[in-house]
Amino acid sequence: MIERGKYQSLTMVNWNGFFARTFDIDGLVTTLSGGNGAGKSTTMAAFITALIPDQSLLHFRNTTEAGSSQASRDKGLYGKLQPGACYAALDVVNSRNQRLLFAVKLQQVAGRDKKVDIKPFVIQGLPSHVKPTDVLIESVSATQARVRQINEVKESVAQYEGVQFKSFSSIVDYHAQMFEFGVIPKKLRNSSDRSKFYRLIEASLYGGISSAITRSLRDYLLPQNGGVKKAFQDMESALRENRMTLEAIKTTQADRDLFKHLITESTNYVAADYMRHANERHKKLEQSLSLRSELFSSRETLIEQNRLLNQVQQELEMLVESESALEQDYQGASDHLQLVQNALRQQEKIERYQEDLEELNERLEEQSMVVEEAQERVLMAEEQSTVAENEVDSLKTQLADYQQALDVQQTRALQYQQAVQALEKAKVLLSDSTLTAESAQALVAQLTQSEAEQTQALLALKHKLDMSSAAAQQFENALKLVHSIAGQVERAEASRYAKAAIQQARSAQQVVQNENQWRAQHRDLERSLNQQNQAQALVAEYQKAHQVTLDDEVMFEQERERHHAQLDSLEIALEENRELRSEQRRQEQDLQSDITQLQAIAPKWIAANDALEKLREQSGAELADSQSVMSQMQQVLEQEKQLSQAKDKLAERRSQLESEIERLASPGGSNDPRLKGLADTLGGVLLSEIYDDITIDDAPYFSAMYGPARHAIVVSDLSGIEEKLVELDDCPEDLYIIEGDVDAFDDSSIKAEELEGAVCVRLNDRQMRYSRFPVIPLFGRAAREQRLELLRSEREEVVEKHAKAAFDAQKMQRLFQAFNQFVAEHIQVAFAADPEQALVIARDKRNQLTRTLAELEAKEQQMRSQIQNSKQALTMLDKLAPMMAVISDDTIGERFAELEEKIAQLADAKQFLNAHAKAVEQLESQLAVLDADPEQFDALEAQYQSADSQLQALKKQIFALSDLVERRHYFAYADSVDLLSKSSELSEQLKAKLVEAERTRSRYRDELKQQQEQMNQYNQVLASLKSSYQAKLETVQEFKQELAEFGVSADEGALERAIRRRDELHERLHTSRSRKSEYERTLTSTELGMKELAKRLKKVQKEYVELRTFVVAAKAGWCSVLRLARENDVERRLHKRELAYLSAGELRSMSDKSLGALRLAVANNDDLRDALRLSEDNARPERKVLFYIAVYQHLRERIRQDIIHTDDPVEAIEEMEVELARLTEELTMRENRLAISSESVASIIKKTIQREQNRIRMLNQGLSNISFGQVKGVRLNVKVRESHEVLLNGLATQQEQHKDLFETARYTFSEAMAKLFQRVNPHIDMGQRSPQVLGEELLDYRNYLELSIEVNRGSDGWLQAESGALSTGEAIGTGQSILLMVVQSWEEESRRLRSKDIVPCRLLFLDEAARLDAKSISTLFELCDRLDMQLLIAAPENISPEKGTTYKLVRKVFKDHEHVHVVGLRGFGQEQKPKSEAQQMIEEFEA
């Protein structure tokens, strides 16, 4: 690692108080400690004077004068010196371990100004053991010494081998030497640099934040950059070249823009209107066809609806008439039903009352029987009670009279015997041995009934016999009854006829009894017959509707199955039709989507096709597919590359020629423009200028003789040239300098020998140079002019070839660009199928699908109608289903006729009964009279005798049985027989019997009483029943009378017939009303539809007539427009197919926009302006075509035939584009130089700014952790001024926007920069500065930056570093940090100027360090240690010498002589740094 150079010591000779004092400078901090006036400031002044020996800058003052503008006249230096020679010397060891003694000799100059003469010098290579005082002071004796003069010093130094002494006549040279050896951080080229350095040292010395430095931080921290000036020169040259090209481009652009603008706008203006008329004509034709189709269809629909309306009206009239009759019938049926229902209710009442009567009659009979039984029981009870009473009385009598009792018992025994006899007699008469007394009573009843029958028969015979014998009149009456019934009959037949009449009456009764059954059958058959008639009507209606006759149930089932199958098939077909329609609609939507897509693609395809055709014309290739386009594009690219390479070679050759011409045209013909400046700097003349007048024949010789030195600089004296050459910053690698008289140059010093075609030059005894004559000599003006003439001729030829090659290359490049643009924009669609043909096909398919959809809808409507018919048929069949059983039954009529006959018989029977019922009833009672014919009396008498004998025998039996029954009580007297034999026991038995008899009597009395009470109750019930029966009977008679008044038949059949008729009429009426409502709705809707249709028909007819008139009228105008366009060959330019897909509004908008642009474009051309004004008449579209033709004719006249070889303005635009591209390319090449120059200006400034920002950021890192009092850090902020940043952006990226500044001859580049700055920052006042001055300032990047210093102080954070905001110690520490940053910046800036193995010394000062506290001083020590810096401070006596080296200064006065006593002390807290290997080797060598 390279070590930093260090100050080793400061030697002061003959200063006030210091005759010969050397202060060793510590590697860290050197402290000068002492009281006031001890000499601390003097010591520092000596150091600074040796460092900056410029009296115009040196001004040593104390801190009280820090802000004073006026100070002592000697500026603090004169008074610090003793008379005579004085020295201040700095002993330095640099990074190369070279010992250097930089010193200044100072001597007071007598006079009022108190000036000091300063002469700097340097001693290099002084041995380490030799002290500076050894060469500056000469010892006269052991106690006396003398200050040597500078010459003596030089002589003294000369005694040391290798030691060099060098004095300097200028401070610049002195500082250049110091910079070269790494003593100062910056190269001080002039007084400004020295002033900056001195200000830094002064600020360091007095401490604090120097306003002089902080205000000029940019000058201190930011180095200059000469690259901008170079960029400025490049830009100025590029601007000059640009202006000529720009004028040519502007001319071509003006023509191109005029052609392009007029063609584009006129084409848009006329073509938009042209295509709008074409589209409108096409649309009007389609619209007229559509209106005509609609008109015809509307007429047919109107006729159909009118026919339907008339039919509906007729049916409605018929329906209204039938509905009125139906309403009357329905009302009558409702009234009849009401009567039948009332009659039925009355009949129900009668029947209910009759039932009650029958029930009352039954109850009455039952009650009568109950009463009779009760009477019998009462009689029996009375009889038993009487018997019991008699028995008791008898027993009492018998007990009272025993003989009587005995007689009674005898009587009873006799009665018992008679009863037994009677039983035996009865058994004999009846021949029944099982007969008993108990069974005799039942048998008596049977025989009594037989007796009654036989008695009746006997009485009848007796009656007949009596009648026959005594009542002939009765026979006549009965015969009359027979005659009234059967008419005149024979007397013998009267009985037969009477019986027949009675039989007929009985038959009639039976017929009447069958009335209900027959009526029910009649109702059923009538219902069946009605069903049959209704079914036949439905069959007829079905046959009328479906042309099918339903003969039987088989046919019915077949028809039902057919309709079900038809329904299923229709449903399936309807679903298929619906799916098919959905599919057709989907296809229609797809087609519509395809049409929309094709319409969207069509303009792109048309544009692509046009571009493809244009490419085919330009390239001459077929370009059948994309592959051929790509291959042709590759061929064009290769051709363009070949042409571009040829053009580039020509351009390169042109550049070479121009460079050579420029070089040859320069003074001396030097190929390096820097030589002229160097010649001026060195005070010489170019050798080529001296030989400028030689002849062309001598030019080869002299050119070969001087060889590489032909561009040498001739100077009058070589002394001092080396020093000047060292100061050169920029010079050629080889620079030849020849000493000679410029006015009378002599080449005799060159030992040259001319050979054949060459020159041999002997440089010295060991070197020689052989140079052949150049083929093209350039030495001398004559040779250069000859060469220039040839080069210029060649350049013209090359320029012409380059222009042609550039034109061809540009044309090929435009062709490649056209290919490239085609590939980028159109290749995807160019080779696709023609969308217009696809559109025609798609539209045809869509129309076909529309027709198919209409057919499908009609078919669906038809199927729905068939489905409806089938459903109606099935409904009719469902109605017919229950009736089909009767429709084929032919017997219903016969049975109904038979029942009608029976009903008629019933009527006859009722009529017979009504007529002869009473007669038959009388006749039936007198029928026997007719049988008893007087002629038959004997037979009747014999029959009577026989019947009487039988009756008598029966009576005997009954008598015997009755006697037995009467004597049945006597069987209880069986014991009386025994009592007769036991008379003794008779009394006791009688008493017992009496008791039993009394008990029996009591029981019989109770029973009698109960039976009498019960009979009374039964009699009461019987009386109430008779009363109820009578009342019910009267009510029934009244109800029958009321029922007779109704005049209707009150039976279930009548009600059912009435309800059925009422319901049938109601259904028919409801159906009629529904049909009427439907007809009325149909009528209303049809009338409304006809009105709307008629209105629409009128409107359509009117529109059609108007549209047809318009179409016919427009056709003639369109034909004239079309003929005019074809005759003038503009149809292909006006008929833009892509415009056909735009709406009329879009086309009109396009035309209007173009019209506005054309008005401005042709404002200065009377002919075109008049033509445009005439073309604005929309009623005359041909005038727009005439305007387009006029524009074309005008443009043909404007074509520049010198550069364009066509009469077509469109092709002329293409050629102008090529020419413009060629000129633009030239401009671009120059603009690239301009852009590169301008961009380089901005780039250099930006990069420099960025580099400096990074460098300052690195500097900040070293100061971020320092601490002085409350200050915890120091940093430097750098930012670009906003106004200048806008300028940089405008300069770098907005060149096109600011061309008017940089491409005009009115402004230089600096002025253009100033104008640009004013343009982008209009708010900034420029003051009195001229644009040139401002522009030069803007070329300095440092003016773009703003620098500020901030400190991190306490709770305030980062704030601006100002002395007023900081304490004294904080300000001093901050100031030292800032100065250290400046020093570091200078070192970085000057690194490229010095040797890489040199690291400069770094030292600062600080006077009156007592203003810092111990912590701040410690921070300074640490800062010096960290940054490898040396610090020289003057401190009071209270500074502790812990680190560094401390010198104790005490000024002592001895008589008239002052002396500063110095005691040196190295800090005890300082660590000894390890010595480097070089230092150890030097110490060992010196030892």
From Swiss-Prot:
Keywords: ATP-binding, Cell cycle, Cell division, Chromosome partition, Coiled coil, Cytoplasm, DNA condensation, DNA-binding, Nucleotide-binding. GO terms for biological process: cell division; chromosome condensation; chromosome segregation; DNA replication. GO terms for molecular function: ATP binding; DNA binding. Residues 667-784 are annotated as: Flexible hinge. The keyword Metal-binding does not apply. It comes from the Bacteria. The hinge domain, which separates the large intramolecular coiled coil regions, allows the homodimerization, forming a V-shaped homodimer. Homodimerization via its hinge domain. Binds to DNA via its C-terminal region. Interacts, and probably forms a ternary complex, with MukE and MukF via its C-terminal region. The complex formation is stimulated by calcium or magnesium. Interacts with tubulin-related protein FtsZ. This is Chromosome partition protein MukB. It comes from Vibrio vulnificus (strain YJ016). The gene is mukB.
